UniProtKB/Swiss-Prot annotation:
It catalyses: orotidine 5'-phosphate + diphosphate = orotate + 5-phospho-alpha-D-ribose 1-diphosphate. GO terms for cellular component: cytoplasm. This is Orotate phosphoribosyltransferase. The keyword Transferase applies. Homodimer. PROSITE patterns: PUR_PYR_PR_TRANSFER (PS00103). It comes from the Bacteria. It comes from Xanthomonas oryzae pv. oryzae (strain MAFF 311018).
Length: 219
């Protein structure tokens, strides 16, 4: 497992963003783990997370020249990532959307750098159903930008339904024709659990969950 994946999972565990136990998801599935990016709730934690994002993006080799953060969790993530890249000598323009359009001040739903003519990388925490990402794709295209990729912290690698054996990330990637990059995924989490004595008891529930809900790419 590459360093940024291990580093991210260690950070998530330390921040209590990654928890093990029994959690009921919005889908109704009972999951042995839960990820909440909102627990990266300080400057240091967010800066460390952004470095993991940057390493994953660089390793994937995606071509982009602007960062876009969908409201709401994508906004601080994209901002932190822009700061991480500035520290690496790359000053990237940044934009995000608001949920409700303003009819005063600067107006509209978009804030930040103009999207027109840019290759846009969408930054978010996870892809659950893909609704927010699909909305972001529409916003970017309507503003004249070209979506070039999507990056998220964790890919659960689980099927959308018994009828659709793809994950939400796979479905979005296929529909949009762009890569979805994850800092880490369920396969990485299984490897991480196997290598950590404190987590070894959670490996069997994780394997059982993958066996029931995992996509074909998690084997």
């Amino acid at each position: 497992m590459t360093d940024h994946r291990t580093r991210f999972l260690q950070l998530a565990l330390g921040a209590d963003a990654l928890r093990f136990g029994q959690f009921t998801l919005k889908s109704g599935r009972l999951s042995p783990y839960f990820f909440n990016a909102g627990r990266f709730d300080s400057g240091t934690k967010t800066a460390q997370l952004a470095q993991c994002y940057a390493d994953a993006i660089d390793a994937a080799g995606v071509d982009f020249d602007l960062l876009f953060g969908p409201a709401y969790k994508g906004i601080p993530l994209a901002t932190a990532l822009a700061c991480a890249y500035a520290g690496r000598g790359r000053d990237l323009p940044l934009a995000f959307n608001r949920k409700e359009a303003k009819d005063h001040g600067e107006g509209g739903t978009l804030i930040g750098a103009p999207l027109a003519g840019h290759k846009v990388l969408i930054v978010d925490d996870v892809i659950t159903a893909g609704t927010a990402i699909r909305e972001a794709l529409g916003i970017i295209r309507a503003a004249g930008g070209v979506p070039s990729g999507i990056v998220v912290a964790l890919d659960r690698q689980e099927i959308a339904s018994e009828q659709d054996r793809r994950s939400a990330a796979q479905a979005v990637a296929t529909e949009a024709g762009i890569p979805v990059i994850a800092v880490a995924n369920l396969s990485d989490l299984l490897a991480f659990a196997a290598e950590n004595a404190d987590l070894v008891d959670f490996r069997e529930p994780l394997l059982a969950y993958r066996g029931r809900y995992g996509t074909d790419t998690t084997g």
